[in-house]
Amino acid sequence: MMVSTARAVVCLSLCLCVCQVRGSHIPARMNKTIQNLLQHYNISNKDRFNGKPVFPKEPLSGRMETKMLFMGGVLETYEKLIGQMLEQLPNTTPPTAGSREGLNSAAPEVSVRTDLNYILKKVQELRTNRFKEQSKLLQGLHDLGDIKMNNFIIQSKALWELQWMYEEASSLSNNTKMQRRRRRRRRQARKVKTPTRA
């Protein structure tokens, strides 16, 4: 579990670094915090670069809507993952009046907890400010997974709704094809209208 957690933190830092290269601003404090956390969640290079990223990169090469939905899911997953990391940290107990060792041993966990809370806050802010629509859609998809498949009433109602759902899905598919054709025609028309310079 610790290895997958560390991989996730590495992927978060990689994603944030990639975003920075693309022009997004990552606060210096956030970069430093991630580096501090990577020191705590230290894994070998063999584990870090084993060719199996926590989050696949393929969805990021698709259409913008797909990328936005995927990144909304990634941010939601990071919220859950960082929450799990916080739960796994040992609870720090306040030191007794004569004890100094409790203070020294609790300091790294307190720092890690503070750093994780900061990163969690930043991820939540990004998700709520820029991925509201995707969050709603993802919640709807999660709700679909919670449908009780073995319930007779649910089965009957689902059959009743199938005609409408099937028609909607078919028309969406057709609309997408039509939009592609229109875009292709517009591009071809622009090519024809644009005079070639000799």
UniProtKB/Swiss-Prot annotation:
GO biological process: immune response
Molecular function in Gene Ontology: cytokine activity; protein homodimerization activity; type II interferon receptor binding
Position of the signal peptide: 1-23
Domain of life of the native organism: Eukaryota
Family: Belongs to the type II (or gamma) interferon family.
PANTHER family reported in the protein's UniProt record: INTERFERON GAMMA
The protein's name in its UniProt record: Interferon gamma
Provenance organism: Paralichthys olivaceus (Bastard halibut)
